[in-house]
């Protein structure tokens, strides 16, 4: 299994530099790839803040990517839930990941962030 960094994923998704897109596609499509949540967070940040990609488009692009059989992440269900929160709520992606863990894996999350606390499941 190979790990890719944010630059590989960005070139693959954006297809803004043909030569790098082709090389990224060869890596992503040609072997088993693991994408850590830290890399996903960087991809989300760059797409939103530097490229101005709408949140829903980010969600759809990453869902398409992680739906590939050869792509693994820390926890697909948590990431999918995080992407839903990120696309619908005015929260940053790391908070969306915390909500994913809270809603999917029932992990208790502690925060001083009032907005985040309103979205947490409490048992």
Model-inferred region functions:
Residues 30-32, 70, 104-108:
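Short active-site oxyanion
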Residues 1, 99-123:
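Acidic, PIN/NYN-like endoribonuclease modules and their adjacent C-terminal/linker elements
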Residues 1-35, 50-60, 114:
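Short, well-structured N-terminal submotif of metal-dependent ribonuclease cores
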Residues 11-13, 46, 119:
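Residues that scaffold the ATP/ADP-binding catalytic core of kinase and kinase-like folds
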Residues 8, 39, 78, 98, ...:
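Alpha-helix capping/helix-boundary segments
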Residues 9, 42-46, 61-64, 81:
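A general alpha-helix detector
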Residues 37, 60-87:
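Acidic catalytic patch
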């Amino acid at each position: 299994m190979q790990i890719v960094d944010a630059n590989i994923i960005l070139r693959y998704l954006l297809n803004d530099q043909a030569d790098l897109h082709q090389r990224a596609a060869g890596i992503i499509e040609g072997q088993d790839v693991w994408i850590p949540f830290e890399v996903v967070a960087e991809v989300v940040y760059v797409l939103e803040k530097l490229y101005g990609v709408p949140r829903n488009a980010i969600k759809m692009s990453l869902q398409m990517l992680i739906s590939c059989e050869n792509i693994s992440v820390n926890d697909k269900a948590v990431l999918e839930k995080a992407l839903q929160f990120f696309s619908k709520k005015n929260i940053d992606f790391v908070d969306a990941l915390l909500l994913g863990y809270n809603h999917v894996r029932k992990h208790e999350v502690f925060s001083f962030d009032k907005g985040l606390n309103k979205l947490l499941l409490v048992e």
